[in-house]
């Protein structure tokens, strides 16, 4: 039962911040800080009391250290299905830590609409935690989209003009268009996977464990894998679909930049590890050379362009493109050590 609370804490905390602004402008800051500290402490407690592994062996089936399942839209086989293992817990620990830091970063910087700012900040973090816990694909998509709208408001309302002179509205709109387009591709891939599985098994379900057993025709399998890859590649971001990141990073408030580079990019890498590779193992193996080539291009392109930047935030954005290239290569290298290295780099970046 603790898993829903990991998601509810940021959402409830955000609502309380919005309400509390009417009484005292400093109160939302303290509520946001308390919410993030509570999330981080709960994550540490789970880490200390559990026995976790990064991922089970392929032959052993799925083993969740903690699991929560509640019917939601039964007609379409959609449930509130949450699962926690070592990989998702590491990401939630990182989210809690950077959540605390992002509240501190915004303490003096944000002076207008403090309550609404912290509502958006905490709802981004709540959506991220939901992404890391969801093992129903519709629920995963729901949280994936939910964390994007507050990020748009964060950039559009509290951002500032970067060194290139582009406005915060332009950067926010570019971010929104790129991420919504990738979200649409992901939705089509999820619906395609569910439909093909329904045709072969007669069971309509969005559950991760059931879809892992889906028997997919070779061409369809590759096409659906590409849909997932493109959706995650935009968010990661992978060259050449990276152009939204430098603008969004430069124009975002400091707390937004912390969340963007520190957490949001990792949701895409997590999605590749959790969904793209296990759901489409053979197609992913065929596609691996292309993915690793894109990662290699990203490493050098991001590093060289970072050298030319005079704005610190844009420099960090391009270095993020470079670092996520290493993560992409690690994910598609096909060895346990490479995956562990990718996770370590995701934590360290």
Give short role names for the model-derived ranges.
Residues 49-78, 164, 168-172, 177, ...:
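Juxtamembrane/interfacial segments at transmembrane-helix boundaries in multi-pass membrane proteins
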Residues 10, 85, 136-156, 204-206, ...:
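Functional transmembrane alpha-helices
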Residues 1-2, 16-119, 205, 209-213:
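Transmembrane helix-loop-helix hairpins at membrane boundaries of multipass inner-membrane proteins
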Residues 19-23, 27, 51-52, 108, ...:
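Membrane-interface elements of multi-pass transporters and channels
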Residues 1-8, 26-37, 83-93, 115-119, ...:
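Alpha-helical transmembrane segments of integral membrane proteins
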Residues 1, 79-90, 133, 225-229, ...:
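Hydrophobic alpha-helical transmembrane segments of multi-pass small-molecule transporters/permeases
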Residues 4-19, 34-46, 92-106, 124-125, ...:
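Central hydrophobic cores of alpha-helical transmembrane segments in multi-pass inner-membrane proteins
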Residues 23-25, 119, 123, 127-216, ...:
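Alpha-helical multi-pass transmembrane bundles of energy-transducing inner-membrane proteins
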